[in-house]
């Protein structure tokens, strides 16, 4: 098994790591073309994405003597360990050093002694074949002098897995599990869209725990859904103690969100669910798998309120968060692009904090919000049957997977608002 095979997905990053390894194994071929081996590699990304695994795969494939430094001592003891490790690496050169969680080396955000020490150690081995790998959760917290070329020539941003990577990671873990045959990996990837690698692994393991406790021979969709909701989103799938009226209103609200997003950007809803955040509560949310343009995003945010008001004939409550988010998006749009012409656009480069300026922006914002609310209600009114079926399906199943939503929406031809 190749060392890089331990990295599931992330093909572009693997290619970059393999190129560095190739330079280590074939230095003469690169030197013949005047290429110099980079002095360092920085892997930057939030926790739980497998940065350390990637670094260790490169270290293993290189076949070089490798040394690792982690912050687990007092400042004085740590600085001594750092210097000793670089000294050992220099004596064993060609070699590699892994500075794991380097942004955690400093215990005080105002202290740079540890980072200065790293710079000094790297400069001391400048003329020796010592390759330094560092993993960080946020490179913005590091001094610019440490990140300059000549120290960390290569910087790789490690993002959360995209849908393809998530499917590959899920497929890898399911090789060790017994999933029900009707579970589609694509649906699981949509359930876990935007999740970190650690969250993927934790949710899949939790699903197996639930299945075993239920004395089930396979892991069902319900087990996976429960695991994702509790492990990743920290909500309960149990809404049985909530009032029926609350359940119906929540289903209607979420159905509005789904309908508008699918009508304006087909295939964008990853999954939708009804859940509970507190005892006797019923709420819900939908997750999207792609970016939306501003207008689609605003109308989707207003769709829950609009769907409930169309159905119940009264002002919907509990939609303040959606309204605030929609207003924030419209405000950014108005202040940078304008609404009609350049009305409201900041063309001077200076913020107008006067009462007149604030009143003008507020007037434009309210007018735009009302316009989008009316437009959203028109679209939902023209597609009432779709909203009704989505609401009924949510009440029945509580969670609609991506395939469920596509199956329902595929039976309807979108009716444009008049």
What are these regions (language model features)?
Residues 131, 144, 159-225, 301-309, ...:
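Conserved C-terminal "switch" segment of AAA+ ATPases
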Residues 227-231:
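Terminal C-lobe "cap" of eukaryotic-type protein kinase domains
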Residues 2-189:
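Walker A/P-loop NTP-binding motif of AAA+ ATPase domains
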Residues 17, 42, 59, 118, ...:
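Residue-level signature of catalytic and energy-coupling elements of molecular machines
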Residues 46, 249-252, 258-418:
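Soluble catalytic regions of large protease machineries
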Residues 101, 223, 404:
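Ca2+-coordinating acidic residues in Ca2+-binding motifs
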Residues 237-250:
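Short pre-active-site segment immediately N-terminal to the catalytic Zn-binding motif
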Residues 9-13, 114, 196-200, 248-251, ...:
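An acidic site on a long C-lobe helix of protein kinase domains
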């Amino acid at each position: 098994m190749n060392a890089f095979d331990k990295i599931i997905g992330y093909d572009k990053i693997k290619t970059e790591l393999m190129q560095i390894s190739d330079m280590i194994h074939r230095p003469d071929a690169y030197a013949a073309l005047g290429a110099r081996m980079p002095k360092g590699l920085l892997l930057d990304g939030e926790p739980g994405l497998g940065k350390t695994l990637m670094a260790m795969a490169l270290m293993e494939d290189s076949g070089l003597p490798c040394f690792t430094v982690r912050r687990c001592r007092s400042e004085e003891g740590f600085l001594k360990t750092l210097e000793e490790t670089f000294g050992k690496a220099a004596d064993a050169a060609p070699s590699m050093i892994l500075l794991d969680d380097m942004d955690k080396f400093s215990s005080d955000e105002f202290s740079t002694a540890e980072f200065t020490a790293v710079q000094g150690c790297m400069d001391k081995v400048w003329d020796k074949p010592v390759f330094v790998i560092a993993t960080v959760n946020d490179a913005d917290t590091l001094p610019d002098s440490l990140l300059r070329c000549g120290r960390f020539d290569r910087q790789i941003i490690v993002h959360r897995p995209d849908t393809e990577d998530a499917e590959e990671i899920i497929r890898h873990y399911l090789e060790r599990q017994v999933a029900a045959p009707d579970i589609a990996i694509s649906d699981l990837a949509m359930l876990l869209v935007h999740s970190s690698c650690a969250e993927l692994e934790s949710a899949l393991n939790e699903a197996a725990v639930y299945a075993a406790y239920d004395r089930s021979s396979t892991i069902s969709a319900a087990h996976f859904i429960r695991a994702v909701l509790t492990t990743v989103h920290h909500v309960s799938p149990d809404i049985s103690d909530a009032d029926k009226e609350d359940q119906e209103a929540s289903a209607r609200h979420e159905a509005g969100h789904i309908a508008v997003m699918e009508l304006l950007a087909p295939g964008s809803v990853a999954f939708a669910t009804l859940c509970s955040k507190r005892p006797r509560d019923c709420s819900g949310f939908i997750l999207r798998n792609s970016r939306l343009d501003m207008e689609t995003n605003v109308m989707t945010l207003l769709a829950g309120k609009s769907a409930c008001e169309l159905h119940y004939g009264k002002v919907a409550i509990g939609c303040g968060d959606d309204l605030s988010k929609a207003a924030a998006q419209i405000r950014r749009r108005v202040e940078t692009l304008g609404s009609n012409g350049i009305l409201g656009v900041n063309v001077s480069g200076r913020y107008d904090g006067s009462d007149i300026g604030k009143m003008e922006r507020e007037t434009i914002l309210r007018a735009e919000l009302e316009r989008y609310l009316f437009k959203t209600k028109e679209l939902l009114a023209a597609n009432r049957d779709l909203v009704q079926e989505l609401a009924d399906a949510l009440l029945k199943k509580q969670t609609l997977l991506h395939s469920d939503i596509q199956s329902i929406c595929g039976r309807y031809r979108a009716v444009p608002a008049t």
